Design a protein with these regions (language model features):
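Boundary at the C-terminal end of the N-terminal hydrophobic targeting segment
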Residues: 34-35
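N-terminal secretory signal peptides
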Residues: 1-19, 23-29, 39-93
Length: 247
């Protein structure tokens, strides 16, 4: 189950894996690939994109340049055959619908898995606590109740994201891949980016934030942007004991 192992209980327990999979619609599911080129193959191969997926929308920023921010669409599989239940993998796009540009990939692990990573590896992973509690992360295909359950589940997860198309305004991917970081405190987001996202999905980040604060029961995190590419992420506080504050 994707839940933070080192902290608190939420006002309602997060979903177990069965409940989580039940929420995932077959968004972006692909038809099985035919195997006509192999006469001995009677059954078609299944596409890696087939099966239950979740779509959620967040605001990404570049770790090396926190002012570089853009709305990013995530299409994530919850069953990767990775050998454990604490791993998702996501394809990232600049928009929904046909013609969207493939920006990159993101991998998501539980807090328990993150804690076991080598120290040198952790600099690539960003926290999701502020994205959830600040209202920046939404799941457009879910009902409000299901979205809340989902957000409680991913609250303390960590993501490793690279944008291999660093500037979606270019006709083709130009430049080196961008290591992506997360917004982690009030005042860090570009309000124009938030406003554009809210208009597109007809939602209110402020109302989402208020509802999640009430349901989850924690203050929003307050973590400064990374000083450099080697900085490690934190989930709740800028220094000291990295634990949440109850409302």
């Amino acid at each position: 189950m994707l839940s933070g192992g080192h902290i608190m209980s939420l006002r309602e327990p997060p979903m177990d894996r069965r409940e989580l999979l039940a929420l995932f619609g077959a968004i972006g599911a692909a038809a099985p690939l035919a195997a006509d080129d192999h006469e001995g193959k009677k059954e078609p191969h299944a596409s890696p994109l087939a099966g239950p997926h979740a779509h959620f929308c967040g605001i990404h920023m570049a770790k090396k340049d926190p002012k570089f921010q853009l709305v990013t669409q995530h299409y994530c599989t919850a069953d990767t055959q990775a050998g454990h239940d604490d791993f998702f993998q996501c394809i990232l796009f600049d928009r929904t619908g046909p013609g969207a540009k493939l920006l990159g990939v993101e991998y998501i692990v539980s807090d328990a898995v993150y804690r076991k990573l080598p120290e040198e590896e952790k600099k690539y992973w960003h926290a999701h606590t502020y994205e959830v509690l600040g209202g920046g992360l939404i799941a457009p295909g879910m009902t409000p109740d299901d979205e809340m359950k989902f957000m409680k589940t991913i609250l303390t997860t960590w993501g490793k994201a690279w944008h291999t198309w660093p500037d979606p305004s270019t006709a083709v991917p130009i430049g080196e891949p961008l290591l992506i970081w997360s917004l982690m405190a009030d005042g860090q987001v570009d309000e124009k980016v938030v406003a554009a996202r809210d208009r597109e999905f007809k939602c209110s980040t402020a109302k989402i934030r208020a509802a999640r604060a009430e349901a989850i029961g924690f203050e929003v995190p307050n973590v400064a942007p990374p000083k450099d590419l080697n900085a490690l992420g934190r989930q709740w506080t800028n220094d000291g004991d990295d634990k949440p504050k109850k409302k």
